[in-house]
Design a protein with these regions (language model features):
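P-loop NTP-binding module
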Residues: 1-228
């Protein structure tokens, strides 16, 4: 139910100064659907923080296939790309900077759109200006939540992770290969300060009850233990 989902998201709320949300990507799965899934999760997470009284900024850093503006029914004419193209200024009152175009989309929740699409966003994401922008934005908000492209599809997520304090890695139940999870978590840990944890999405209460059964756990461990 919707209330149960909100309780789950609320349990993730903590005292972090910065977060990046990384949706899982499976090579056999269409990258576009992975981006849509991750977008819903990220917007729900940011909304949960805002409802807990945190001044929250949600940034759409998926510069190839931006989705956040659609979730909030906004235009995508200003944002990271337009800011970068107009000199990448990091001084002054950034929430009021017209080249950034930060929009208030809810009580305590603001949105920084991508500002269009880019076929080669690496120049922006690995720039000192982008790192300085994230650092400065933390002065205006209690929490900054970043939506990134699916991990594994492109290198953008790893570039973003290097600029953040914490990473939450999202895997969809029955869609993630164990070897891929280990590979990507290792890559994240080598490129950022901290991997806060892994969130398993799509696991119903019925499945949770089944997997918590001791007999199943023993057979699960026996089967997968040999793959460790």
């Amino acid at each position: 139910s919707a209330s149960r989902k909100m309780r789950i998201f609320s349990s993730v709320v903590c005292r972090l100064p910065f977060i990046v949300w990384v949706p899982f990507y499976r090579p056999q799965t269409d990258a576009a659907s992975g981006s849509i899934l991750g977008g819903h999760l990220t917007s729900n997470l940011a909304g949960s923080f805002a409802r807990h009284g945190k001044r929250t900024l949600l940034i759409d850093c998926d510069l190839r296939r931006p989705m956040m503006h659609r979730h909030f029914k906004q235009q995508n004419t200003t944002g990271l790309i337009t800011w970068f193209e107009n000199g990448a200024n990091v001084e002054g009152n950034l929430p009021e900077d017209p080249t950034l175009g930060i929009i208030q989309v809810g009580e305590g929740l603001s949105l920084l759109c991508s500002g269009g699409r880019s076929k080669s966003p690496t120049e922006i994401l690995e720039s000192k200006a982008f790192a300085d922008l994230l650092s400065r934005l933390k002065r205006f908000y209690d929490l900054v939540v970043v939506d990134s492209p699916p991990l594994g599809a492109v290198t953008d997520s790893l570039l973003i992770a290097q600029r953040t304090d914490e990473v939450i890695y999202v895997c969809r139940f029955n869609r993630a290969y164990k070897k891929h999870i280990r590979l990507y978590v290792k890559a994240l840990r080598s490129g950022c300060n901290e991997v806060l944890g892994i969130v398993l999405n799509g696991l119903t209460p019925r499945r949770i009850e089944y997997y918590s059964d001791y007999r199943y756990y023993r057979s699960y461990k026996k089967y997968y233990g040999s793959q460790s």
